[in-house]
Amino acid sequence: MRPSGRAADALRPITLTRQYTRHAEGSVLSAFGDTKVLCTASVLAKVPPHKKGSGEGWVTAEYGMLPRATHTRSDREAARGKQTGRTQEIQRLIGRAMRSVFDLAALGEYTIHLDCDVLQADGGTRTAAITGAFVAAHDAVSAMLRDGQIKASPIRDFVAAVSVGMVNGVPVLDLDYAEDSNCDTDMNVVMTGSGGFVEVQGTAEGTPFSRADLDAMTRLAEAGIAELVRHQKQALGL
């Protein structure tokens, strides 16, 4: 029995609340159980230097945790004067995930800048961030179409992410903190709505995992992401 009482192949309760804040072109509160991430998407009429004059746009992300998102307070990274390696890794992952489903040429020389701020952490913050950020980006694109900034949507597919792992020899889906901190294997999987893999990050924390374990975790992730994409479509009214 999992600490949450869920079946091995069950996601936590998922909610994707759109228009959560007022000013951003897209804003979503992404909740995976007790993990809550605010994802905002801002449209900027500029591109980074390596895209200037190319006719192409860019999609990028920043990620951070509020000081009391976890059990004990942590200092703001701005107060420390530098980002941790973990923060840099996660925000690059979010950016790569979004760009995997964007036609940057169709975006034109605009940037969609995603900010993912963890309000409360209970495992799976990066996967909640990716899943919510896509919905926020979709709303930002809708705003660009409405305002005449672009003529056609640059979004080619959906993208979502979920964690899987081996806990006491059993493959499980969407780990919360209690499981994540005691698992044998921790893996994050990013996939498109059409079933393509964008990223697979997996590490054995203790006992090495077998090819059969890997296949079982991958199958769990595929099913979980298909369900998350259904949540995204439902949130967007598609």
From Swiss-Prot:
Highest taxon listed in the record's lineage: Bacteria
Positions contributing to phosphate binding: 86, 124-126
Swiss-Prot/TrEMBL catalytic activity: tRNA(n+1) + phosphate = tRNA(n) + a ribonucleoside 5'-diphosphate
EC number in record: 2.7.7.56
GO molecular function per UniProt: 3'-5'-RNA exonuclease activity; tRNA binding; tRNA nucleotidyltransferase activity
Pfam families the record matches: RNase_PH, RNase_PH_C
Record key words, sorted: Nucleotidyltransferase, RNA-binding, rRNA processing, Transferase, tRNA processing, tRNA-binding
InterPro entries: ExoRNase_PH_dom1, ExoRNase_PH_dom2, ExoRNase_PH_dom2_sf, PNPase/RNase_PH_dom_sf, Ribosomal_Su5_D2-typ_SF, RNase_PH, RNase_PH_bac-type, RNase_PH_CS
BP term (GO), one: rRNA processing
Function description: Phosphorolytic 3'-5' exoribonuclease that plays an important role in tRNA 3'-end maturation. Removes nucleotide residues following the 3'-CCA terminus of tRNAs; can also add nucleotides to the ends of RNA molecules by using nucleoside diphosphates as substrates, but this may not be physiologically important. Probably plays a role in initiation of 16S rRNA degradation (leading to ribosome degradation) during starvation.
Protein family membership: Belongs to the RNase PH family.
Subunit structure, interactors included: Homohexameric ring arranged as a trimer of dimers.
UniProt-listed PANTHER family: EXOSOME COMPLEX COMPONENT, EXOSOME COMPLEX COMPONENT RRP41
Protein name stated in the entry: Ribonuclease PH
Protein species of origin: Cupriavidus metallidurans (strain ATCC 43123 / DSM 2839 / NBRC 102507 / CH34) (Ralstonia metallidurans)
Gene from which the chain derives: rph
